[in-house]
UniProtKB/Swiss-Prot annotation:
UniProt keyword Membrane present: yes
Further comment found in the protein's record: Partially overlaps YOL036W.
UniProt keyword Transport present: no
Compartments, record wording: Membrane
Lipid bilayer topology: Multi-pass membrane protein
Protein name according to UniProt: Putative uncharacterized protein YOL037C
Upper lineage: Eukaryota, Fungi, Dikarya, Ascomycota, Saccharomycotina
Alphabetized UniProt keyword annotations: Membrane, Transmembrane, Transmembrane helix
A single Gene Ontology CC term: membrane
Transmembrane segments: 32-52, 56-76, 87-107
Amino acid sequence: MSKLSRKSILDEDEDVEEILPKTRGDERSTWVSSSSFVSSSLIFCKCVVTVVELDVGVALLGIVGRVVPLYTVTLLEPEFLNLGGELSWCSMTNFCELFFYFFSFFFSKKRPNIDSK
């Protein structure tokens, strides 16, 4: 009799094991597919953000490499600032020149000639 009861308990356990893995498998496959979609979209967003950061970083390096030396040269000119510390008209023209060089750097393939004065 103990063998019979043991067998019936084992049969019940097998039935439970047959039902549970299917349920767990379905839930798990849904979870895996949704998590893989989320992770792939996050990876895509991270790649886009990284590319944008690289573009902005390269652009900033280009600006710093081109504009800062020119700006320091114009700061060393004696007529750039008046004695009150306010910007003079000459400094505004130098400021406009900075923007001209900045835009010509991005819209032309060769470097603008800074020493043309």
